């Protein structure tokens, strides 16, 4: 087998390799407990533990339960997230964009035609490098009307500059929601956690979650502000290598966001977007390792299926 083929095979481990890797990583440094929940419920639970600033949303099947569960837990005093119900998904995405530009941590959830209604907003959010997290419970795009699960909606996001993490069970929905925000703030890009509508969004499984919200918040880390004289550009890396973020509400550091661009600025913007995507390839394995040391659950880029005897994948 050539070096290229070998590296390709290693990049796409088999299901058996993935399972053995996960089982081998038994060291768990954080207390956890069992929950019997669906993907939607665990997406909401992860958001509750993160304690986002804002969720701009508009309900649509099969992702409606995410906002519903967050609203219920908020009524119980379990988080401080401000849920803002918009008049439609386009407006919900605008709420998220404005809140992120204002320095907030932002969360959203949608599906199918709701995603398409908001589609215009997504390249703007990535192109102006606003970190946020959106869950997509994947569903058939209507035409004719259908609410069954497929990937016809998420495919529209492929060229919008968003990172997409696909979760194939409720446990991964929980884990990826925690990893997604940290990744978003590492590379200054918005991240989608996508999962199958009804199959993953509604079916319940036994899952492990961190016992304390503080564990999650320590893993995510604080969102660093740019109230620092050494920081002179949007999302400039500081001496520690951590991203710091401007806020349009920070009057001490005024900044214009989304201003008009011609060549060569627009070309440079797209190249910077490409570099951020490439940086994701480096950051994501590091975050997987960090998360595994905390949870005992190891994730990889891809899972192979019947790849054991393949020469090329």
Stretches found by the model and what they are:
Residues 191-304:
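Conformationally flexible catalytic loops at phosphate/diphosphate-handling active centers
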Residues 2-3, 23-156, 161, 178, ...:
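Thiamine diphosphate
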Residues 7-9, 15-24, 224-227, 236:
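A cross-taxon signal for low-complexity, glycine/charged-rich
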Residues 171-205:
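Conserved anion/nucleotide-ligand pocket segment
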Residues 160-172, 189, 274:
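Flexible, glycine/proline-enriched loop segments at strand-loop-helix junctions
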Residues 127, 180, 207-209:
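Short basic, glycine-rich beta-strand/loop surfaces that mediate nucleic-acid
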């Amino acid at each position: 087998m050539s070096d290229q083929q070998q590296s390709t095979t290693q990049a796409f481990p088999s299901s058996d390799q993935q399972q053995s890797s996960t089982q081998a990583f038994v060291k768990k440094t954080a207390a956890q407990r069992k929950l019997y929940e669906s993907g939607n419920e665990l997406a909401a639970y992860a958001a509750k533990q993160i304690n986002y600033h804002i969720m701009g949303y508009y309900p649509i099947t099969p992702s409606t339960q995410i906002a519903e569960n967050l609203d219920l837990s908020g009524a119980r005093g379990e988080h401080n997230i401000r849920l803002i119900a918009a008049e439609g998904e386009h407006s919900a995405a605008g709420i998220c964009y404005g809140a992120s530009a204002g320095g907030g941590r932002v969360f959203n959830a949608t599906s199918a035609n709701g995603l398409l209604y908001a589609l215009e907003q997504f390249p703007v959010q990535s192109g102006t490098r606003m970190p946020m997290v959106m869950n997509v419970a994947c569903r058939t795009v209507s035409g004719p009307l259908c609410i069954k699960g497929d990937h016809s909606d998420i495919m529209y996001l492929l060229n919008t500059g968003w990172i997409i993490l696909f979760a194939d069970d409720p446990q991964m929905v929980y884990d990826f929601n925690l990893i997604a925000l940290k990744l978003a703030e590492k590379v200054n890009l918005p991240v989608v956690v996508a999962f199958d509508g009804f199959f993953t969004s509604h079916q319940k499984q036994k899952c492990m979650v961190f016992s304390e919200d503080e564990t999650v918040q320590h893993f995510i880390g604080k969102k660093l502000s740019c109230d620092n004289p050494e920081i002179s550009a949007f999302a400039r890396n500081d001496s520690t290598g951590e991203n710091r973020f401007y806020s349009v509400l920070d009057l001490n550091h005024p900044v214009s966001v989304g201003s008009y661009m011609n060549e060569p600025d627009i070309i440079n913007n797209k190249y910077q977007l490409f570099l951020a995507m490439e940086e994701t390839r480096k950051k994501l394995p590091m975050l997987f390792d960090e998360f595994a040391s905390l949870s005992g659950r190891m994730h990889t880029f891809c899972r192979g299926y019947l790849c054991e005897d393949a020469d090329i994948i």
